[in-house]
Amino acid sequence: MSPDTVGAVTDRVGPVRSASSRRQADWAPVNTAPSVPAVEPAVAEPVGELIVDWYDGAARDLPWRAPGTDPWAVLVSEVMLQQTPVARVEPVWRAWLARWPTPAALAAASPAEVIRAWGKLGYPRRALRLREAAIAITERHAGVVPADVDELESLPGIGTYTARAVACFGHGQRQPVVDTNVRRVVARLVHGRGEAAAARAADLADIAALAPQDDARAVRFSVAVMELGALVCVAGTPRCGTCPVADRCAWRLSGYPAADGPARRVQKFAGTDRQVRGRLLDVLRAAAEPVEPAALAQAWDDAVQRSRCLDSLLVDGLVVQTDDDRFSLPE
């Protein structure tokens, strides 16, 4: 139940892929950051409770957060929310589950069907990886999404963040779930930094220490702190006046010190290979039969860039070339 990171969004103590309304893709913790003080539980728990109380009154009405949402629906939402805003995900998520309500149903679909249904969510390799995960769930787990984090992480395309998110939000387990939004909240609230450093193993310990002692409240806290980062503790201009823990925020209390290092560059889209790949896939999605190279040439004028992007789509398994040198989605 990943909210978007307010603009890309991603993965389990035991990585929600962007633009502030996007989720960071799954990440692997790195241990190069300097050590930071542990969160004191006596101080941390009231903070966690305050965040849950705030969430109970401020949460967005997102369908994958509804009580009783099954783990498969949660898994689909988490994969879609990586790198894609909530507003674009919701209609596709609903249509996807109406068409493929179980892992077995998706496992039986063709790659072409899956790519077409993915539409314009972006990063379409996620669609193929989700299908591969559905096949693995069907073959290894009798069609039931596993609850164990390690088993989840062994599925194709499922990283640490997604595995913990499914275990927590889909199976109701007490699991620290850390995405870009959560790391930013912890960086400011606990460590007094305006921006989060690179993902690190200590992030999981930080968020676990902040969680309420009650297991059910801890599960709710995991989504509540994401929502706080998505709606209030945002990357650009945080809305500290509406923050439920502003009076305990180390960054605010220290006078909002500026982040170290160069400002982050805004990622452009126009003219990138991502845009070209999308244009080529649009042509193939709309075609009932394999298309001639000339049809793809109409989608993008730059022949060198077009050829490079077409090659990358072939390598990624998103496009196939026929014996007569036409192109189509994989069947």
Question: Which functions belong to the PLM regions below?
Answer:
Residues 49-277, 285-294, 299-304:
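Catalytic cores of DNA base-excision repair glycosylases
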Residues 300-314:
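Short amphipathic alpha-helical interaction segments
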Residues 314-327:
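A short, conserved structural fragment
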